[in-house]
Regions:
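Residues in well-ordered alpha-helical elements
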Residues: 19-22, 52, 92, 102, ...
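Residues at alpha-helix termini
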Residues: 60, 96-98
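Amphipathic terminal alpha-helices
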Residues: 72-74, 86, 91-96, 103-123
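A short glycine-leucine-enriched loop at secondary-structure breakpoints
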Residues: 1, 98-99
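Short, small-residue-biased leader/transition segments that mark boundaries at the very start
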Residues: 1-3, 51
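Residue-level detector of short coil/turn "hinge" positions at structural boundaries
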Residues: 66, 101-102
Length: 123
């Protein structure tokens, strides 16, 4: 199975893994009301990575055969949309409240492989 990447390799995106999102929901539920003050909106911490950095991290974790499945086929329409998304957020309030980001893309990939019980060579 191949995956087509619809944006250019240098496209940056803000990332938070599904595991950290679920963790954030649970953490938010467990916070006392006073921790929120009058504003109950918070941007969650995350990391910024380019699509190239994500693919390179996948190669370091899953091997070159995983990278070989990626086909760079940028779609101008999709890229125009994605490039309007913010690439970085300042999240000091969220961090002070105890929310956390993934440390790096490799950790996100390793967690996904473990959570999905993916075995080497499985496609």
């Amino acid at each position: 199975m191949c995956s087509s990447d619809l944006v250019a390799p240098d496209t940056g995106v803000w990332l938070l893994s599904p595991a950290r999102v679920v963790e954030a929901f649970i953490h938010a539920l467990e916070l006392p009301a006073a921790a929120w003050g009058t504003n109950r909106v918070v941007n969650l911490p995350g990391i910024t990575a380019t699509v190239r950095e994500m693919v390179e991290a996948m190669g370091r974790v899953a091997g070159p055969e995983a990278v070989q499945r990626v086909r760079w086929k940028p779609d101008a329409r999709i890229e125009a949309i994605v490039r309007t998304w913010p690439v970085r957020f300042a999240t000091p309030r969220a961090q002070q409240m105890g929310f956390r980001a993934d440390p790096d893309v490799e950790s996100m990939i390793r967690d996904y492989i473990a959570d999905e019980n993916i075995k080497p060579g499985r496609r």
